[in-house]
Amino acid sequence: VTDGVVTETSGAATAGEDAGLIFAPSGFRFTDGTNPVTIGAQIASKGSNVAPGAQSLYLQAIRTDTSTGACVGAFPSGSSVNVQMASQCNNPTTCVAGKQVSITNNAITTPIASNPNAGVGSYTSVPLLFGANSQAPFSFNYPDAGSISLHARYNIPLQGGGASPDNMLG
């Protein structure tokens, strides 16, 4: 290798068989439609979109455009994507059985996995409809009191359609 290009020369391989490698960092962010936001304090058993303290919340999927380096939407408008979502109990550090956070998007409500403060290992698939700017509007309801964190991940598929070891996180 003299010019930074890796080529396999064993067997019957040819240089034309080398796959191109493209890196495009990606992730999720929770926004108010325009800016990343910290989700405000909520009242137990009340939807996040209901007053008092109502917030318009979105999960935005973004990636780096490999040509410009700018952040762009990762999913086209109108895409329905199964995103893995979870909650993490921070204070208290363990979750109460049967008191799951539920996520609502496009009139579909899905209870999501609860995880202790020690770490997030369980997720639930949530169908999300992404609109303009790769944003999925959502509301959530937590039927208990305490401090929680929300997590999102999406397995980035291989070009051939199979699962990869890489996840978009947020």
Where are the language model's segments positioned?
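Core sequence-specific DNA-binding domains of diverse transcription factors
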Residues: V1-G170
